[in-house]
């Protein structure tokens, strides 16, 4: 359904996986899909395809420039080596590309590392991002300009998640004291990455289905 494309990134060129809906389903809405710490792997491409089946134009930028991880140790190294300033340019470029295609503000949706970057991109691009979804997001090097956030945030969290869950109280406090619109859900009995069906040891079908329904509802409401 999708293909790799090139797009502008701060005067340079970035790449990403673009999935386009069929004409009979197209909503004229765009979603930036942001990778887990594994990189732009097949799972993330399938998520972009899944959005296209729902009628959204979806672009998943390749933040690791072609690198992917085969083990948690490799993934952690790639996550920590990520240049946040360069990632910000890639995310802005993806937002701008989708806004050009759709003619309107877009959404950001991210998983794991990408969950933090979804919120980061929404904070950094308030005029261009109208909805934000965070799946169990975290990244130790990302700092958020919460004052700049305009998009309503949907947070999807696992019950058992030492990586991401320390962020829940912080995000709620920062969003709440600024009267930002947000809605958080924690899925009982789940672990980090419960949406990733390539990881049977953590995948939870019921939580994946329910969280996807909430994601689509959120995007439909605000885009």
Q: Language-model segments: what does each one mean?
A:
Residues 63-66, 138, 190:
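Short beta-to-alpha linker loops that shape the active-site pocket of alpha/beta-hydrolase fold enzymes
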Residues 162-168:
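Conserved alpha/beta-hydrolase "acid-adjacent" motif
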Residues 59-60, 134, 184:
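Hydrophobic residues in well-ordered beta-strands that form the structural core
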Residues 4-101, 195-199:
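Serine-hydrolase catalytic machinery in alpha/beta-hydrolase-like enzymes
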Residues 94-150:
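Primarily recognizes the serine-hydrolase "nucleophile elbow" in alpha/beta-hydrolase
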Residues 176, 181-223:
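C-terminal catalytic histidine-bearing segment of alpha/beta-hydrolase fold enzymes
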Residues 149, 155-157:
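Short beta-strand/loop motif that positions the catalytic acidic residue
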């Amino acid at each position: 359904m999708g293909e790799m494309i090139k797009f502008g990134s701060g005067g340079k060129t970035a790449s990403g996986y673009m999935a386009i809906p069929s004409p009979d389903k197209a909503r004229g809405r765009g979603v930036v899909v942001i990778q887990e710490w594994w990189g732009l792997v097949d799972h993330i491409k399938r998520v972009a395809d899944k959005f296209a089946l729902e009628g959204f134009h979806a672009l998943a930028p390749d933040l690791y420039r072609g690198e992917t991880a085969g083990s948690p140790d490799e993934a952690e190294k790639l996550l920590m080596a990520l240049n946040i300033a360069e990632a910000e340019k890639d995310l802005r470029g993806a937002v701008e590309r989708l806004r050009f295609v759709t003619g309107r503000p877009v959404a950001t949706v991210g998983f794991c590392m990408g969950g933090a970057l979804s919120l980061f991109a929404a904070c950094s691009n308030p005029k261009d991002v109208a909805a934000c979804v965070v799946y169990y997001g975290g990244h130790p090097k990302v700092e958020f300009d919460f004052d700049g956030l305009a998009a309503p945030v949907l947070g999807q969290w696992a019950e058992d998640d030492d990586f991401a869950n320390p962020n829940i109280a912080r995000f709620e406090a920062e969003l709440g004291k600024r009267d930002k619109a947000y809605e958080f859900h924690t899925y009982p009995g789940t672990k980090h990455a419960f949406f990733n069906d390539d990881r049977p040891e953590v995948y939870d079908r019921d939580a994946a289905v329910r969280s996807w329904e909430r994601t689509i509802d959120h995007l439909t409401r605000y885009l």
